[in-house]
Amino acid sequence: MHSLQAKILDPRLGSDFPLPQYATPGSAGLDLRAMLKEDSVLGPGQTLLIPTGLSIYIADPGLAALVLPRSGLGHKHGIVLGNLVGLIDSDYQGELMVSCWNRGESPFTIAVGERIAQLVLVPVVQAHFELVEAFDESQRGAGGFGHSGSH
């Protein structure tokens, strides 16, 4: 297991509400909570930037973190991430914030301390551009959207 530096920015985290943790031994994501001052109603089409009460420092440039939606919130209630996926760079040290968007048709109440997203560590491979005049030919070539076949 990889070590991850974290700072608690909201004293309710770790006392009133559990610290981010893996739900099962096979879980890929750590649950992030809505550390709001009070419950908040998110109307249809609205977005809200939600603090998690936590900052992390990954430090290792070979890693990054992704903030991903919780599948149940999206499927059952239409609550997804406003930016679809959040990318946390290894050198970022600020508070983790979650942009929530209600794409559903009904208002949804986000409760204080509710699990709203998950944090997943992923490997990163940085690349440098090698400028060329032409590419070696491939089977696909420049075929774009829908080029590889239907369904």
Curated annotation (Swiss-Prot):
It comes from the Bacteria. CDD domains: trimeric_dUTPase (cd07557). Its EC number is 3.6.1.23. This enzyme is involved in nucleotide metabolism: it produces dUMP, the immediate precursor of thymidine nucleotides and it decreases the intracellular concentration of dUTP so that uracil cannot be incorporated into DNA. It is an enzyme of class 3 (hydrolase). Belongs to the dUTPase family. Substrate binds at residues 70-72, 83, 87-89, 97. Pfam families: dUTPase (PF00692). GO terms for molecular function: dUTP diphosphatase activity; magnesium ion binding. Its cofactor is Mg(2+). This is Deoxyuridine 5'-triphosphate nucleotidohydrolase. Keywords: Hydrolase, Magnesium, Metal-binding, Nucleotide metabolism. GO terms for cellular component: cytosol. It catalyses: dUTP + H2O = dUMP + diphosphate + H(+). InterPro entries: dUTPase, dUTPase-like, dUTPase-like_sf, dUTPase_trimeric. Pathway: Pyrimidine metabolism; dUMP biosynthesis; dUMP from dCTP (dUTP route): step 2/2. It comes from Pseudomonas aeruginosa (strain ATCC 15692 / DSM 22644 / CIP 104116 / JCM 14847 / LMG 12228 / 1C / PRS 101 / PAO1). GO terms for biological process: dUMP biosynthetic process; dUTP catabolic process.
